[in-house]
Amino acid sequence: MGREIARVLGAGRKENGYMTGNGYMVTWTYGNMLSLAMPKDSGTAHVEWKDFPLLPPSFLTVRHVKTDTGWNPDINAVLQLKVIAKVLNACDTIIAATDASREGEMLFRHLYGFLGCKQPCLRLWISSLTDEAITEGMANLLPCDRFNNLFLAA
């Protein structure tokens, strides 16, 4: 999805994990790069019913994968999150172009919050990746706060 949008926007210069050009920086996620934090992520080794509700300081963490040494952060997710943070920090305004759905909105909002992003954001709301749909969507960007209820519904 990101590469198609980058092509239409004229951001054809390939970088490590993102594309640039024509005044845009376009990056992407793959799957859910964040997951819910487990009790051990906040230093709690053993949890009992009396401990609930258990609300860690941050309820999101980088997705973990099972390896020979146990559950460890997904290194590919860690690396791409660093790229996304770099791109977000370099921009004055963020254009959220995740899937036009509750889940897409939630994915963006979780990343935005997890990375501590403060820049204003606009929403590219398209249901097709045709050149025409992307061009029309870019001409009709909406403030992200118009989608607050969609995020809350997710």
Regions found by a protein language model. Name each.
Residues 1-154:
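Intrinsically disordered, low-complexity regulatory segments
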